[in-house]
Every structure is written in C-alpha cells, then in structure tokens.
Amino acid sequence: MINDERMVAFINSFDKGNTSFLNQIEKEARADAVPIIRTETQTLLRFLMAAHRPMEILEVGTAVGFSALLMQEYAPAGAHMTTIEKYEKRIPIARENFKRAGKE
C-alpha cells in the first residue's frame, strides 16, 4: 500500500484511466466486495508494464481477473501471462471476464 501523499499524487499524475470494459469489471468487483488494486497501484502497474515490456508474466491471486486484464492491455504483443487463484468461487468469474475480454 502506498501511504505517502506526495508519492500518491505523483503516481496519480500519470493516470490515464482504464477502458470502459475494465471500469465495468472494477465496478462489479467492488459491488461484490472483491479486492481490486487501488487506482495508484493500477497507474504504477501500467507504467512498469510500459517501461519493462515483459514477455512472461506470473500473477498470483487472480480474484476476478481485473489486474491480469489490465496488464494484458499494456503487455507487448506475444507476451504470455499465467495467473492463478485458489478461491474456487472466483475462478468461474475470472474465466468469464477473460472470455468477455477475448483473452481466454
């Protein structure tokens, strides 16, 4: 968690916002009390993806797939992502979100 207000303001200055699709997933997740990364973490993640352009990504803790889909938007073409989730009730929701995004 990022606590320093100046750091948060700096990170948020780079925020471009999300696609309407990601905004919808985030809204649904919050309505269902599913943890989603904070706005400044989303911004930092987008920056890191653009700066490092990883070809292999491992995400631990998929939840509903929000972070994975965010990273896939900023990953270079041909990048491969593996994401895992242990809470079985969320796995079908994540799969459905990947399907809705065309990332199945």
Provide a role label for each language-model segment:
Residues M1-E104:
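A short alpha-helical cap/connector motif
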